[in-house]
Amino acid sequence: MWVDSQIVMEDLEVFSNLDYLQWEKLRNKRILITGATGLIGSTLLKALMYVNKSKNLKLSLVALVRDKDKAESKFCDILRDTKELSFIVGQVEDLPDNIGKIDYIIHGASPTASDYFMKRPVETIKTAIIGTMNLLELAKEKQVDGMVYLSSMEIYGSPRNEEKLSEKDVGYIDPLVVRNCYPEAKRQCEAMCVAYANEYSVPVMSARLAQTFGPGVDSQDKRVFAEFARCAMQGKDIELLTDGSSKRCYLYTMDAVSGILTILLKGTSGNAYNVANEDTYCSIYEMAQEVAKNFANDTISVEILNDSEAQKKYPPAHFLNLDVKALIQLGWKPTKTLMEMYGRMIHQME
């Protein structure tokens, strides 16, 4: 078996035994994944390949990738074990013609780094808008059984109070701020999904994911959760470039995967669903303190630098307290606390 980590094996076993997922809907189906080499996409791919083997579903996965050599290297153990995973070289902005029959689409291709949003806002928008339009056209052409667009909790903008945010709530986003190219593009992509669902009866849903991490995070990842983990592992003080007052929910990688598949198999076309662990809601400063306490035995401190230039990379102070009731009503539930997420991520990084 190609699983070389006890933690990942535990996650896959739990995932494959989730009784609220309608596995039979995937039998003999062909699933297209974009963004398959990213954190969520790669976890999703591994999870589906594991379930396919354990339940003999005879499903096949095709991943759209920019760099086939990179993808084959990343998933070499799976490729040695099965013929039911294949790669198509291309990009979402210009889909290749050789995709073939598709039953389900999970569209996760997207930049995720704040630095990239600031330096390449045009490319951020083009990847989102053109890519999603192309995938929706493909879904219409192939008459797929279902499609999920991976959106973000950032579409809620910068709420100034801590009230729960349901899928019906909207927040303020200033389109004149360069970094907001990302949430504005995500909003437009969700609107396109609704348009295709209504005009062409494409069975498409959006998953509004909280910030997601766990096993599989690259040790050089620049996002704040990975930086906190590295500081704890190296015994370095955690330095915050903002005051750390923003509060949000988080999500474990495998919980993200189970949420996405719940939406794909049980969601209502045209709807969006929050995907988060409500119990993880905390400020960035509070999270830093908990990491220092739990993984560095309080031997490191949390310092607030308040770097005004660096702050331009980040959204203004906000409170993203997601209400996950709609997804829970479909049977989904998260499995890992915030510190469990950190523990499993750090174990993989070591």
Q: PLM ranges: what are they?
A:
Residues 1-4, 86, 232, 236-350:
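C-terminal substrate-binding subdomain of Rossmann-fold SDR/epimerase-dehydratase oxidoreductases
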Residues 1-23, 46, 56-59, 337-350:
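Amphipathic terminal alpha-helices
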Residues 111-115, 153-160, 210-213:
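Active-site segment of SDR-like NAD(P)-dependent oxidoreductases
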Residues 83, 88-127:
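NAD(P)H-binding glycine-rich loop region in Rossmannoid oxidoreductase-like domains
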Residues 181, 185:
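Active-site helix of classical SDR
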Residues 30-50:
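N-terminal Rossmann NAD(P)H-binding glycine-rich loop of SDR-like oxidoreductase domains
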